Amino acid sequence: MLDLKFILNNKNEVIKKLSTRNYDLANITKINNLGEMRSKLIFELEKLQAKRNKLSDEIGIKKRNNENCDSLIEEVNAIKAQIEKVDHEADDIISQVNDILTKIPNLPYDDVPVGSDELDNKVIKEHASLGRGLVKGVEAHYDIATKLDIIDFTRAVKLAQTRFVLYKNAGAKLIRALANFMLDTHINNGYKEIMPAHLVNSKMLFGTGQLPKFKDDLFRVSDSDLWLIPTAEVPLTNYHYDEILNLNEPIKYVAYTKCFRSEAGSGGRDTRGIIRQHEFHKVELVKIVRQEDAMGEWEKMVNDAKNILTLLELPYREILLCTGDMGFSSAKTIDLEIWIPSEQRYRETSSISICKDFQARRAKIRYKDADGKTKYAFTMNGSGVAIDRVMAAILENYQNSDGTITVPKVLVPYMNGITKIEAK
């Protein structure tokens, strides 16, 4: 959430940056107007309170002198009613302002490319020579997985509905291997592992920015205030909800969880395979840092995510997202897109975002600087990485002409020594 004072004092800058984020700028004008109205009400409130206090003093004097003060008491009661009315109007304005504030996206850094959608994103670097390079002419992951009997799509639909899958045999083992490999790698790089619950309350989803704006993208437990997590970013960041932290060293967390998304608005995209599911597996990275340390720590996080794909020897590219394609809470995002041979294109497998103090304001995560001043922390998060999409990439990039799948070298120890997945 943006700071209201910053918006009011830097209206032109805010409008300029939000104009690049497909945001309705009329709301900024509305906030300014509401701010002016509230200032007038507060001025009126202060005058009424001063008048009430003066009359109350006069009543006290008259009572001590045994003089009649009925008319003054009536006047004070009338002023109290006015104060209550003005107070209510001011509270209503605050409610309107907060409602707008909660739905304003983060302001992008100055070096983020301006654009309206993914077509305006900027390719930073391509790592096309990793592994076997940009493979062509292979079976789609969903076809080869069915032949190898490692994913069951049909029974998953029977058990639930479309966009769910059942991993089995070597497929289940590969999912576990990927998760454990990623966790071990990140833990060795200084992240602390947390295993959170898959359910959180609405206050936590507000903290990281999913609510109220993206309610339709979430799964909610009926008749309760519990929601399935769309990403472990939610519990990891809100782990320090409403706390003042010691940030002499960055706080670094990693978690492997299931994630749940309704995929509202995805329509008929990616209806086959494991690219887009309602329930999927992901290793998530979160850092909470001092403001001055943020950019350096974010760049390290980008490298931590890249390291996973490099070790797996899977071709990928780095994309700097434009202003119109970034997530709601992000001030700058780099996507890592992995090569999917059957589609002959790259697909996102990680987004690494720095959020400035946007989430920390919502979640009230603070720290004390060297001078003892309390400040909002800076937060960042990134997929480290999305496991199902990596599995799809392995099934295609490591596919052999005899219909088997070579297990990436770094995963062999996690696969009990299995070097090849083949039909049983």
Swiss-Prot record:
BP terms from Gene Ontology: selenocysteine biosynthetic process; seryl-tRNA aminoacylation
Catalytic activity: tRNA(Ser) + L-serine + ATP = L-seryl-tRNA(Ser) + AMP + diphosphate + H(+); tRNA(Sec) + L-serine + ATP = L-seryl-tRNA(Sec) + AMP + diphosphate + H(+)
EC numbers, comma separated: 6.1.1.11
One term under GO cellular component: cytoplasm
Annotated ATP binding sites: R261, S262, E263, E348, T349, S350, S351
The keyword Cell division appears for this protein: no
CDD domains, sorted: SerRS_core (cd00770)
First-listed, main subcellular location of the protein, grouped into a coarse class: cytoplasm
A Pfam family that the UniProt record links to this protein: Seryl_tRNA_N
Keywords, sorted A to Z: Aminoacyl-tRNA synthetase, ATP-binding, Cytoplasm, Ligase, Nucleotide-binding, Protein biosynthesis
GO molecular function (one): ATP binding
SUPFAM superfamilies noted in UniProt: Class II aaRS and biotin synthetases (SSF55681), tRNA-binding arm (SSF46589)
Keyword Glycoprotein: no
Pathway: Aminoacyl-tRNA biosynthesis; selenocysteinyl-tRNA(Sec) biosynthesis; L-seryl-tRNA(Sec) from L-serine and tRNA(Sec): step 1/1
Residues binding L-serine, per UniProt: T231, A232, E233, E284, S383
Compartments (UniProt record): Cytoplasm
Record-stated family: Belongs to the class-II aminoacyl-tRNA synthetase family. Type-1 seryl-tRNA synthetase subfamily.
Subunit structure: Homodimer. The tRNA molecule binds across the dimer.
General function of this protein: Catalyzes the attachment of serine to tRNA(Ser). Is also able to aminoacylate tRNA(Sec) with serine, to form the misacylated tRNA L-seryl-tRNA(Sec), which will be further converted into selenocysteinyl-tRNA(Sec).
Domain-related comment: Consists of two distinct domains, a catalytic core and a N-terminal extension that is involved in tRNA binding.
Protein name: Serine--tRNA ligase
Species in which this protein is naturally found: Metamycoplasma arthritidis (strain 158L3-1) (Mycoplasma arthritidis)
